[in-house]
Structure formats: C-alpha cells, structure tokens
Amino acid sequence: MIRVVVVDDSMSMRTLLERIINGCDGMTCVGAAEDASAAREMIRALDPDVVTLDVEMPGMDGLEFLRRMMLLKPTPTIMVSGRTTSGSDAALRALELGAVDVIAKPLLTRPADLADYARDIAELIRGAAAARVKGGALAAASSAGRERACAHRPRGAKKAGIAATRLSRVIAIGASTGGTEALRTVLQDMSGTPPPILICQHMPEGFTASFAARLDAICGIRVKEAEQGEPLHYGCAYVAPGHSHLSLAATGRLYVCRLEASPPVNRHRPSVDVLFDSVARLAGKRALGAILTGMGKDGAAGLLRMRASGARTFAQDEPSCVVFGMPKEAIAMGAVDEILPLARMGARLSEALQ
C-alpha cells in the first residue's frame, strides 16, 4: 500500500486529492496538511512513501519546504501547480530541487475531467513510489552546477545552424518521470553543433514553454518549444508542447515540425511513440533514438520501429534512471542497440553522429 501525505493550503484541493487517493487501489492518504509547519510534523510522524506538495502556499512556499525536506528527509514528491507562468516556473525549479514530477491543478470544466485527473494523479503517485530520489547534497550540487553553467555560458542570442533537409541526420529523445533533469544532462554533454533534436517529455500543457526556456538558458545549443510547420535547424532542440503530439515531417526538401492535437497515445499527449514512429518513417537509418527515464511503456514500440528502419538506438540504464520503466520495456522488446548510464548518453550520441 502506497502511503501518501497531501500538502495544500486549499481545503477543497486537499479534499479532492484525499478522495482520489483513497478511491484508488493500492494507495491511501494517511494525512493532509494545510501549511509547511503542519506538513513537517506530519511527514516526520507518518513517514509517507509519497508527498503531493502545493507549489504556492502562504508563509513557507512549496519550493523552500521541498528544499528543506530533501536535505533532511528525501521523499518522493509530486508538485501540484497552478496554471500560471509563475506557477509553472516554480514547478520546474522544484524538479531541479529533487521533486519527481509535476501536475497542474485541475480545471474540471467537463464531467470527464475528474476521472481523467484521478487517473493521472494515481499514475504519478505509483511512479513516484517507485522512484529513486536524489536528495540532500546531491540535489544541492546539481542545482549549483546548473547555476554555474548558466553563469559561464556566453551571453547573447544563440543562432541556429543551417536548415535540415531530408538527407540530414536527426536525433529523437523521449522521456517521462525524471526526464527534465536527464534531458538537461544529455543536452549539456553533447558536443559541437548537432543535427536537429526532437524531444518528447511527458509534461502538462502550460509547462513545456518554460521547460524549453530553462534548458535554453543553460545549454550550449538553442532549445525551444516546437511550433507547427517550423523548419528544423542544426544546433537546435525542439520540445513537444504539452497540448500536442510532435512528429517529424517534410515540406519539399526541408524537415519541419508537425503538431497534432489528436487523441492521446499510450494515455499520453505528447506521446514518445508518435515521435519515434514519424522519425522511423522519414529519417530511417539517418536517425538516432534515445529513451530515457520514465514510467510505463510509451516509446518502446516506436524505438523498436526506429531500430528496424536502420536507426541507432539507445536506452538509459537502470541505476541512473529515476524510474526504470520506459527503457526497461524498450530493452525487453529488443529495441535497443546500446544501454548507457545517463552520464555517458550525451557524449555517446555525439560520437554516434561521426
């Protein structure tokens, strides 16, 4: 049984989360706190498996509480964020501090919204319960490293390289739980001016633009949220927006982004399988595919199709994953050429382009 503590200053949100958690098989809400002080005592006394934490609370906010908790008692934590720009920025900062995942507060504008939200929360809690949490000095060192990288990166707008054509190489990367930090590591470790990189990271709508901007600030290449029909360029990474599937497409000789707000695939939109399938069809042996940390199986079948089309494929190894789900499924299917620790992935992708 997964034991969960809910921390939120809104009584209605606490009640909703308690009801959802207690209605799911295999999990129970053992406590609900309205502020950081109550949460600290509750977590100390109840020792939960997972914490859901409101980003924006009066007094000590969710970020400061998370920072202290990760130093003293690292616990898998899901950030529950408002749908504002400030809320999404804070949630992404929480992922840097060691939170496992983030979910937006529900809109509940349709009767089906509650069931969808309950399903999403339950999936995140199960993933968090299986996660390896990086707390204490490790989280602090990781955060400090990002700040140093940002401080020492040359200032000024980064220019994209030449446009990519149908003869160009392409890199496709998929990730879920733990992927925000894994992607940062991979992109920072790549050398030179790589071919276009298409990224599918499972993330709610409203968060991906901020995520891309944060990566852009600390990486040597340009990173942006993908836009419909935009040509792909060398030295640029394109992040799938949270509202649409991202596919590789072509207009004439040029590679472009295709966005489609079609139904979820493997319960995800954007879906890694959708991205990988499009790259397999269009780029074939000129592509590289990598599947990183994450819960579930999204991307495994698509990576197999990439490999069958001649692409070189890679998976993150179990010890370095936050959740060894998606890579495990891909490996079991025979979709993977090389299994690598995260610390080697970026450099190996660069080597494979030679």
From Swiss-Prot:
GO biological processes: chemotaxis
Source organism, top-level taxon: Bacteria
Top-level enzyme category: hydrolase
Principal subcellular localization: cytoplasm
Annotated compartments: Cytoplasm
Active site: S176, H202, D298
EC number: 3.1.1.61, 3.5.1.44
Listed GO MF terms: phosphorelay response regulator activity; protein-glutamate methylesterase activity; protein-glutamine glutaminase activity
Pfam family, one: Response_reg
Domain CheB-type methylesterase: start-end pairs: 164-354
Catalytic activity: [protein]-L-glutamate 5-O-methyl ester + H2O = L-glutamyl-[protein] + methanol + H(+); L-glutaminyl-[protein] + H2O = L-glutamyl-[protein] + NH4(+)
Entries under InterPro entries matching the protein: CheB-like, CheB_C, CheY-like_superfamily, Sig_transdc_resp-reg_Me-estase, Sig_transdc_resp-reg_receiver
Keywords assigned by UniProt, alphabetized: Chemotaxis, Cytoplasm, Hydrolase, Phosphoprotein
Start and end residues of each Response regulatory domain: 3-120
Residues the record lists as 4-aspartylphosphate modifications: D54
UniProt PTM: Phosphorylated by CheA. Phosphorylation of the N-terminal regulatory domain activates the methylesterase activity.
One cellular-component annotation, GO: cytoplasm
NCBIfam families xrefs: PRK00742.1, PRK12555.1
HAMAP family (UniProt xref): CheB_chemtxs
Similarity comment: Belongs to the CheB family.
Entry domain remark: Contains a C-terminal catalytic domain, and an N-terminal region which modulates catalytic activity.
Function as written in the Swiss-Prot or TrEMBL entry: Involved in chemotaxis. Part of a chemotaxis signal transduction system that modulates chemotaxis in response to various stimuli. Catalyzes the demethylation of specific methylglutamate residues introduced into the chemoreceptors (methyl-accepting chemotaxis proteins or MCP) by CheR. Also mediates the irreversible deamidation of specific glutamine residues to glutamic acid.
UniProt protein name: Protein-glutamate methylesterase/protein-glutamine glutaminase 2
Protein species of origin: Burkholderia thailandensis (strain ATCC 700388 / DSM 13276 / CCUG 48851 / CIP 106301 / E264)
